[in-house]
Amino acid sequence: MNVNTARTSAVIVHPVPPAYADCYLVWQQSITTAAAQFDGYQGTDIYPPENDRDPNWIAVLHFQTPADLQGWLDSPQRAEILAQLPPELAGYSKTVLPQGFAPWFSQLLHKPPSWKMALTVLLALYPTVLLLNLLITPHLQGLGRAGAVLVGNAIGVALMQWGIMPRLTRLLKPWLSADSDRRFSVLGGAAIVSILLLLAHLFQRWFF
């Protein structure tokens, strides 16, 4: 069993035209291989779009500590690989989850299982990132791509850190703390997955 006390993650949402999906995957493999050479690297999870009308690929990058993650994000190796992206794939948004998931669950008496924390963060992050990309980012284009990404990320992190996650963890506290009640835990997890699928359906219907 691995106990990760300071795991930190970065969520990168990358709009990819369907015709460039193979190109993106080849590029993603190269940047993942490069990241794996850095201290503290713990893996990358890739989530493809739900269908051809949804362009967003999501990569969740995991490092042991915030310093390890920042070392990769600021590295010349990463900058070199980013520069290899064709113009059609150059736009993306990045959100760093500060110091992993644990601080958002610190008000609970017992730390919830990792899968519950991950589901809770995903429930908060998915609509936040999509709404920012749809409603805020288009109005920041005057700042240039780098400036728009910076401002969008700052807004997303602030919303997650001080607005959404504290309220969501309080709302879900009975479920997050119910380690001994397996049935309640499973039903709660299934309910969150159902909500995420419903959100994906609604976003697809309304915006894509």
UniProtKB/Swiss-Prot annotation:
It comes from the Bacteria. InterPro entries: ABM_predict (IPR038762), Dimeric_a/b-barrel (IPR011008). PANTHER family: SLR1162 PROTEIN. This is Uncharacterized protein Synpcc7942_2318. It comes from Synechococcus elongatus (strain ATCC 33912 / PCC 7942 / FACHB-805) (Anacystis nidulans R2).
